[in-house]
Amino acid sequence: MKQIFIGIIRFYQKFISPMTPPTCRFYPTCSHYGLEAFQKHGALKGFWLTCKRILKCHPFHPGGFDPVPDKKDDKVHS
C-alpha cells in the first residue's frame, strides 16, 4: 500500500508539478514531505501526515520549515 502512495507522488512530481509554477509555502515541499512521511511512517500514518500538511499549504499560512516528525518508539520501557 505504501508503494502505491509513493508511486502517486512520484507521478505527480514527474508529470504534473513541472507544468505548474512553484507555489508550496513550505520546505521541504509538500510532495517531498509526503514521500518522506510514507517512507518513515508507512501507509496509514504517512497518509495522515501528508493530508495534514496539504491542508496547511494555503496563502493564509506563513509556511516555512516543517520537517516530517521522527518515528517514535511505541515500546514502553520499564
From Swiss-Prot:
Keywords: Cell membrane, Membrane. The keyword Protein transport does not apply. GO terms for cellular component: plasma membrane. Coiled coil: none annotated. InterPro entries: Membr_insert_effic_factor_YidD. Its main location: membrane. It comes from the Bacteria. It is a peripheral membrane protein. NCBIfam families: membrane protein insertion efficiency factor YidD (TIGR00278). Belongs to the UPF0161 family. Could be involved in insertion of integral membrane proteins into the membrane. PANTHER family: MEMBRANE PROTEIN INSERTION EFFICIENCY FACTOR-RELATED. This is Putative membrane protein insertion efficiency factor. It comes from Bacillus cereus (strain AH187).
